Amino acid sequence: MARLFSLKPLVLALGLCFGTHCAAADAVAAEETDNPTAGESVRSVSEPIQPTSLSLGSTCLFCSNESGSPERTEAAVQGSGEASIPEDYTRIVADRMEGQSQVQVRAEGNVVVERNRTTLNTDWADYDQSGDTVTAGDRFALQQDGTLIRGETLTYNLEQQTGEAHNVRMEIEQGGRRLQSVSRTAEMLGEGHYKLTETQFNTCSAGDAGWYVKAASVEADREKGIGVAKHAAFVFGGVPIFYTPWADFPLDGNRKSGLLVPSLSAGSDGVSLSVPYYFNLAPNLDATFAPSVIGERGAVFDGQVRYLRPDYAGQSDLTWLPHDKKSGRNNRYQAKWQHRHDISDTLQAGVDFNQVSDSGYYRDFYGNKEIAGNVNLNRRVWLDYGGRAAGGSLNAGLSVLKYQTLANQSGYKDKPYALMPRLSVEWRKNTGRAQIGVSAQFTRFSHDSRQDGSRLVVYPDIKWDFSNSWGYVRPKLGLHATYYSLNRFGSQEARRVSRTLPIVNIDSGATFERNTRMFGGEVLQTLEPRLFYNYIPAKSQNDLPNFDSSESSFGYGQLFRENLYYGNDRINTANSLSAAVQSRILDGATGEERFRAGIGQKFYFKDDAVMLDGSVGKKPRNRSDWVAFASGSIGSRFILDSSIHYNQNDKRAENYAVGASYRPAQGKVLNARYKYGRNEKIYLKSDGSYFYDKLSQLDLSAQWPLTRNLSAVVRYNYGFEAKKPIEVLAGAEYKSSCGCWGAGVYAQRYVTGENTYKNAVFFSLQLKDLSSVGRNPADRMDVAVPGYITAHSLSAGRNKRP
């Protein structure tokens, strides 16, 4: 075994024959061959390195590979196994070496060349010491940091890291991403800088060419994290799908300007195609512009700008249709702006602005979820303060809020009051076991078609906390005062009214624990009884306006609320005692809550009740309906979520919901949920009143593998009272065995109005560590199928497991 160490311009040769010393050197080499050292453990490059071809591997999309990993294997690059050498030294280890000092060295057999972070394995190498250049063949493997290059012939300058190789296979790993390529030639242009010609590349496992990009040339710069391809075609399953004369892409997953993958879908409005372009304007500023075409509607232009600074951040979005062919409307748009500014450690401000061109915008361009959630669009500016004052905590907020209210299909809109402005202040201070506090709120309400005015609410209170490890008692005394100054409106005169109500309540509870075995393991089970007494005297409030109060549905949480109305315009009368008990099951090792269930009821000592119109009525009763719930995991596979509101006087359920989910493994989900309501708010009628009716819905959904690679996704949501499905969704997803790609196709039909539906068909193609084509299925499936995971994510997760 021969070795060479060099440091330009000084050369120190050990065991290398020069002139008359060859015989002695041969003797040393022979002795080392008979007595191997650690350096001789280097394996011959000619044995493990297979002949290189210009193919990434198999292009078969549906080939079976039970291991889920590539079949093609190659030996790793081997070092000399000797002690480290100083920086900028070059070491050559081989079976045989000959040459002339400071001129050129010829090395053959198990050649290993090492310099700094570069290691070269090859069959033979010519080393030019004056130029610090090595020429290698017939096969070589060059390892440098996260880059591995294999090929047939190589000319390489070790100092400048420049050179050229032929019939090359390259693998680059950076930022958790893997890029592999095969090329006719590869030029090394400096550290981490390469130019490849006649190349194919992808981000799959070795031997997997289910998809790849074929290009006349690719220039990759690891320092900049950018690759540029010229005359490139996207090949899927061996078939060219898309061509571009120029394209660039990130090597490390960082953001960069350029075309994003187009999005294609089909539905009730025809085929839609969007081609977005991304602008990486600065590390903290970017933008996206996406021109689109919707078959039956025409051209659409989408734009988005995002910004991020240490003290503020925000995002603005704009969608514009110059002319909607289907509706005949011009200049349809949607605009959004969200901004948050941290002015100081105690002061924050923000903007939330939303606007659309017309009331039908969401019905025409969105699904039923977005339609229901965007009736009143916020346009709000706010300023919040959180700090200390007078020995206690002080929180204050100033906001202005005005809505854009969209009309329903009948043309009616129920517009809320605008807050012009609202100022809220809350101060609290702990003194021993007591806490004193006061909350105040001033609001100027504004409305175009109703009497408006100003309201001041002041609510001082004091509460005590007597608690220990097994229980607590928390009394509270408060005085709720409300003052109104109402403006003249039509025949309604301007006036001032007020209301003052004392509020007294006592909250108490206890916790009992025991260790037991349940669900196949050690758990901690609790039993937690709770009593809540609440007193508020009856007072007629029909002379007060109703700016923002609404009824809350009766459930387990309502047993422990002071006021059963939302808002401050209505305060219920109360002389009642709530009694409830809940039990929780905690993991014995981690303390994580796995399951909880509870049941409770309210007992009334008076029949008075304040109605939503402010009048005081009588409700003969001595106790409320029963409310109960149960939710959590049963074992490791089942999830339960249920609740019920039971009217014991009429012996019937007012509403209930029962849901169960079976999840034996990722990608295997079965969900079933039934919801019933005897008298539920269904929709807003044209006269401004709500239509109430029985609600009875069944929601079934699933994601389940049909084969090792193919999964089905379905949802069926049926309304029994309407006697029609609310939403139907079906899809099929495929994941490649090695996790290189995943694809899905989905069809959906859903209700958008009382007698209207929309249809949609969309597809997705996810490419490992590169991009996605089409819509991201998770955007819709997360809601449609609880527990859903994309096929590509599932495949990637499986590949990560040992």
From Swiss-Prot:
Signal peptide: 1-25
Pfam families hit by this protein: LptD
Subcellular location, record wording: Cell outer membrane
One of the record's GO cellular component terms: cell outer membrane
InterPro entries to which the protein is assigned, alphabetical: LipoPS_assembly_LptD, LptD, LptD_C
Keywords: Cell outer membrane, Membrane, Signal
GO annotation terms (biological process): Gram-negative-bacterium-type cell outer membrane assembly; lipopolysaccharide transport
Oligomer status and interactors: Component of the lipopolysaccharide transport and assembly complex. Interacts with LptE and LptA.
Note: Present in outer membrane vesicle formulations which are used as vaccines in human.
Task performed by this protein: Together with LptE, is involved in the assembly of lipopolysaccharide (LPS) at the surface of the outer membrane.
Family indicated by similarity: Belongs to the LptD family.
Name this protein carries in UniProt: LPS-assembly protein LptD
